[in-house]
Amino acid sequence: MKVAFITAVYGGYERNPHPFIPQTIESDFIYFTDNPNVDSNGWIIDTNPYHDTHKSSLDNGLYINSMHKTGRLKELNNRHTFNICKYYKQNFQNIPRLKDYDIIIWLDGSVEIIREDVAEYMVELCGKYQIASWHNELRGGMLFHEAFSSYLSRYHDSKYLNQWQPYQDIINQYHHYLQEGYDENYWEKFPRVEGRGRGDHFGVWLTCFVAFNNKSPQIKKFLDLWYLQTLKYSTQDQVSFPKVVQDTNIVPYTLPDEKFSGNEPHTECSMFIKHEHFLK
């Protein structure tokens, strides 16, 4: 089995890749960036702009967060580096070098892996559940709380990090989801017993760590639908993730569990350290 841990950092959002613990099975750590001068800390540094050279077929140039608008709309392209990185997080199936991996594990640039058996366990979980992630201990399993906690400058500031971006209307996005049938009570009724994290948090996930079965056709559809939410609505992918879970009925195995502890993964868990972002 081939495993890749991937992240993307454009525009200096993080200073350098965090070091990692070598895994018990062969694993590559791949860092997509526009900065060839970062200290690699063992990561494979890839500066090819796949978001331009291997564009997502989903981006028709007519969405609020399209990167490839043409004609009069071209000046409204969302080329904010925060938006660019969503391509690598949500539509990485377009990247040629990743096609041969069986498991892809997305890490936000702030995440440092501190256990040697993460890849091995993700192979096991993704083989059975297709996706694995961590519960978000701050939201009580309610997407309402995630949406209404997103009044943050990285979504609402048109000059965030001194780069232009369109207003990311997350409250409008949440209301659209309700109109489309999103069910806040879905998770209480979901019958699976195992892989629910701490049950009262089940239903909203930390997308700073998500492992995917890269050989599954269903996961390719999941990722396409997830990225489409970014193009259409906002770059707040923790709001769109539960909606896509409901729409596809692919429900992640949710940590913590007996193998990896951490009821409050924002603060501490046995798998990774979540550092504060470096903002230049």
Residue ranges and their predicted role:
Residues 10-13, 35-37, 50-52, 76-77, ...:
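Short, solvent-exposed loop/turn segments at secondary-structure junctions
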Residues 5, 29, 93, 110, ...:
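A residue-level signal for conserved active-site and pocket-lining positions in enzyme catalytic cores
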Residues 45-54, 59, 65-86, 91, ...:
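Core catalytic alpha/beta fold that binds nucleotide/phospho-ligands
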Residues 158-280:
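Catalytic core and acceptor-binding pocket of nucleotide-sugar-dependent glycosyltransferases
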Residues 6, 31, 104-108, 130-135, ...:
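A structural signal for short, well-ordered beta-strand segments and their strand-loop junctions
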Residues 88-154:
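GT-A fold catalytic core of metal-dependent nucleotide-sugar glycosyltransferases
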Residues 1, 25, 89, 107, ...:
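Residues that flank catalytic or metal-binding motifs in active/ligand-binding sites
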Residues 1-85, 96-101, 230-236, 247-250, ...:
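N-terminal anchoring/stem segment of glycosyltransferases
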